[in-house]
């Protein structure tokens, strides 16, 4: 019995003019998600999804490539203006932000939403190099 060809679902174009870019930059990777005002994901990308593996995922260049890809996907849905929420301690924060600006978005606000504990869990041990 022959397998049925997998149907490719085309995403319908959502006409959304403004949204929120969530940039989560960890020590190992950078994830960018662009959502509408309610928090529904419109486009997402990460350094790992762009083909970077291992320690290359945590570089600023990988974050830039991921942000450019995510911006292109969001612009296909008609997005023009963004609020940016940056989270995490990673090295890809600024480069992802610059890439979103260079892609032609009007950035209305930049917020740092990195969670800071009020003496919560015990942190990781310090690295000795």
From Swiss-Prot:
Keyword Ligase (UniProt): no
Family, per entry: Belongs to the universal ribosomal protein uS11 family.
UniProt subunit comment: Part of the 30S ribosomal subunit. Interacts with proteins S7 and S18. Binds to IF-3.
Annotated protein name in UniProt: Small ribosomal subunit protein uS11
Protein source organism: Chelativorans sp. (strain BNC1)
Function: Located on the platform of the 30S subunit, it bridges several disparate RNA helices of the 16S rRNA. Forms part of the Shine-Dalgarno cleft in the 70S ribosome.
PROSITE patterns: RIBOSOMAL_S11 (PS00054)
Record flagged with keyword Nuclease: no
Signal sequence, renumbered to the chain: none
GO biological process: translation
MF term (GO), any: rRNA binding
Superkingdom of this protein's organism: Bacteria
A GO cellular component entry from the record: ribonucleoprotein complex
Gene name tied to this protein: rpsK
Stored Pfam families: Ribosomal_S11
Keywords: Ribonucleoprotein, Ribosomal protein, RNA-binding, rRNA-binding
NCBIfam families: PRK05309.1 (NF003698), uS11_bact (TIGR03632)
């Amino acid at each position: 019995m022959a397998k049925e060809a997998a149907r490719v679902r085309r995403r319908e174009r959502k006409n959304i003019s403004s949204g929120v870019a969530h940039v989560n930059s960890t020590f190992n990777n950078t994830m960018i998600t662009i959502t509408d005002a309610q928090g529904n994901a419109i486009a997402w990308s990460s350094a790992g999804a762009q083909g970077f593996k291992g320690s290359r995922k945590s570089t600023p260049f990988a974050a830039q490539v991921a942000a450019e890809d995510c911006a292109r996907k969001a612009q296909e849905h008609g997005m023009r203006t963004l609020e940016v929420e940056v989270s995490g301690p990673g090295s890809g924060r600024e480069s992802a932000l610059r890439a979103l600006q260079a892609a032609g978005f009007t950035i209305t606000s930049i917020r740092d939403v990195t969670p800071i504990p009020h003496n919560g869990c015990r942190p990781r041990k310090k690295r000795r190099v």
